[in-house]
Amino acid sequence: MIAAPDNQHAYNALGYSLAERNERLPEAYALVEQALKMAPGDPFIMDSMGWVQFRMGNLDEAENYLRRAYAVRSDPEIAVHLGEVLFARGDVAGAQKLWQEAHGKDPKNDALKSTLARLNQSLKTDQAN
């Protein structure tokens, strides 16, 4: 980032990578916060901030950022993250709905597969159809 101090994507990528590994979360927060200052409307940076907040145990903030990100761009990866936050809050039906949406857009999504496996969940099917 020394070579490109104005590159919000570099800050975001490093911050997200740290959060994904659940390491150095205060540093991850600072990096993503810097990216968000540079590009406040970027849904992928909002997703990263939501994920950092989730890893830090701030479920209200995590849900807020992830809902905003998903409203801007209904990306499968954002849906997976928001679904995991809802699951952690006990909203299994809400999580399942988002995971179904993610699966509909990208059936081979690795983040969805690994999240479902880690949480011992499977996609619920609508038996009425």
Region locations from a protein language model:
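TPR alpha-solenoid repeat register
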Residues: A10, I45, I78-A79, L112
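TPR/TPR-like (Sel1-like) alpha-helical repeat modules
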Residues: A71, V92-D110, A117
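Structural signature of tandem alpha-helical TPR/SEL1-like repeats
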Residues: R21-Q34, M56-R68, G90-E101, A128
